[in-house]
Amino acid sequence: MKRAFLSALSVGLAALFLTGPAQAQGNPGPLRIEITEGVIEPLPIAVPPFLAETPAASQFARDIAQVVADDLEGSGLFRAIPENAFISPITSFDSPVQYADWKAINAQALVTGSVSVASDGRLVVKFRLFDVFSDAPLGKGLQFVASQSSWRRMGHKVADAVYSRITGEGGYFDSRVVFVSETGPKNARQKRLAIMDYDGANVQFLTDSSAIVLAPRFSPTGDRVLYTSYATGRPQITLLDVNSVRSQGLGSAQGGEMSFAPRFSPDGRSVVFSLTNGGNSDIYRRDLSSGAQTRLTATPAIETAPSFSPDGRQIVFESDRSGSQQLYVMSATGGEARRISFGPGRYGTPVWSPRGDLIAFTKQNQGRFHIGVMRTDGSEERLLTSSFLDESPTWSPNGRVIMFTRETSGAGGAPSLYSVDISGRNLRRVPTPGAASDPAWSPLLP
């Protein structure tokens, strides 16, 4: 079954890249990522240091180019050629490209750029992408302007544009991740919300450690975060403004003792969450403007972890109504739910892909935890990871990568954040200042 899946993956990805932008321009040798025996061969790409058009831009030029190279290589789809292999330096942003020199080091793509500091102090970043194989530019050059403090974002934006032009998919580099930062011993950890760039840079703390916080979730616009707070001594849903770092409780849930596992609807106007009353947990939906609350499930089972489909019409959630923890899908207005998980073991924390085609989940089976994906009808289940404890998956904005929490065994085991491609490749640890859990990936930043 694994071989069959890899074969199908090869065909799908090959079709994707062969119909990408390069072929659309009619080039004789389209820029693409080669796939052999179900394994993606990373595309060799050269990203020389960007040119500094003004002296004040010198360090920015080198650093921004490094962010671009790191982003692309970190995706697992590209291999950044080291600078010491370059034959000819880039001396002018507008000078003709010496394609033969880049072919000699087996580069298939080339990114050139320049950085200047405008009179108002802002950075101006220009870049161009070239198909070395076809001796031609790949699309038009682009320019980004932003404050100097946003230099890393400009690198991410360039990388997103390069990624998109070569793969035909949207990028995911100019995004952020909110997570739970943990300190202290395992049996008495202090938890606070933190936010960072997708690659672990620019960490900022959003709450102090006076109350336990869990399960942060971004709004569709990325400027608000829902999370569960124990500030009152019991779990309560709280809404935080990322820019002002101000938070407010959503008030006591109607008819319940505890509310947790919140998530925004795709339009940002309502939230779904679990509400516990008398030991029973059901799924509810609440309008953020009116406060009106609707019960979506009504069974004796424990039902939690709801997640909307991208079109807002359906909700996937976990329930033990069948006797074990499984995944179900129902209308966003409630009603009859259909079970979609039937494999061995227990399933939880389902999250709908932003593409709408897959659902990510946590699975426990035979003493191991896995992050997996399945079609929205439950078919084509694939396990991407396996460890002592993997949980809490969250999708990248383009639906290509999943970030999750991994914890090692033993008394001193601390959770960390990892990411993996939906093919199960490119498992990477995401750097954080300390222990970290419960990641939530933002949409692309505006």
Swiss-Prot record:
Its main location: periplasm. Keywords: Cell cycle, Cell division, Periplasm, Signal. GO terms for cellular component: periplasmic space. GO terms for biological process: cell division; protein import. The keyword Signal applies. Belongs to the TolB family. This is Tol-Pal system protein TolB. It comes from Dinoroseobacter shibae (strain DSM 16493 / NCIMB 14021 / DFL 12). The lineage of its organism: Bacteria, Pseudomonadati, Pseudomonadota, Alphaproteobacteria, Rhodobacterales. The gene is tolB.
